Regions:
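N-terminal beta-strand motif that seeds the catalytic metal site of vicinal oxygen chelate
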Residues: 1-19, 78, 134-146
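Vicinal oxygen chelate
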Residues: 4-13, 44-48, 66-146
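A short, acidic/glycine-rich surface segment
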Residues: 32, 61-67, 104, 138-139
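Core segments of cupin and vicinal oxygen chelate
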Residues: 2, 10-54
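Conserved beta-strand in the GNAT
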Residues: 55-57, 129
Length: 146
């Protein structure tokens, strides 16, 4: 079966801090942020690529849900694949924003074979892996695409 990742949802405690991290450090385009701030939509999002978004659920949504926190103990990390050039720029932004690299650069196997990865956490402790694959076009912004 072939499919696309449509979205991932993070339950967040401080949505403004998370919007800032994912839009300024990770360079994911913010979506519906002004509408969220105006109370017109229930949560903001950031776009990873043309097919995938990350929804940032504020506490008022996930605290009242019967499913709040379910599965959190099962999520180890998520991984984004970048061109080598974008990966190197991310390293600089992480350093400039005092984000600690927990591991890496290290070789890792993934969806496109062997790549080079780093691991770090967002402001609320979610573990993120960022990798590049040798030989991919360095002008590509993000390899997560259909």
């Amino acid at each position: 079966m072939q499919c696309l990742m449509d979205h991932i949802v993070l339950n967040v405690k401080n949505e403004e801090r998370m919007i800032g991290f994912y839009s300024k450090v990770m360079m994911f385009a913010p979506e519906r942020v002004e509408e969220y701030r105006a109370g017109e939509v229930p949560f903001p999002s950031v776009r990873l690529n043309s097919d995938t978004i990350m929804d940032l659920f504020p506490k008022k949504i996930w605290q009242k849900s019967d499913r709040a926190g379910q599965g959190l103990e099962n999520l180890n990390h998520f991984c984004i694949a970048l061109s080598k050039g974008m990966w190197e720029k991310l390293l600089k932004r992480l350093k400039a924003n005092n984000v600690d690299i927990e591991e890496g650069p290290v070789p890792r196997w993934g969806a496109h074979g062997n790549g080079t990865s780093i691991y770090f956490r967002d402001p609320e402790g979610n573990l993120i892996e960022a990798r590049y694959y040798e030989g991919h076009n360095s002008k590509e912004k993000c390899l997560l695409k259909s």
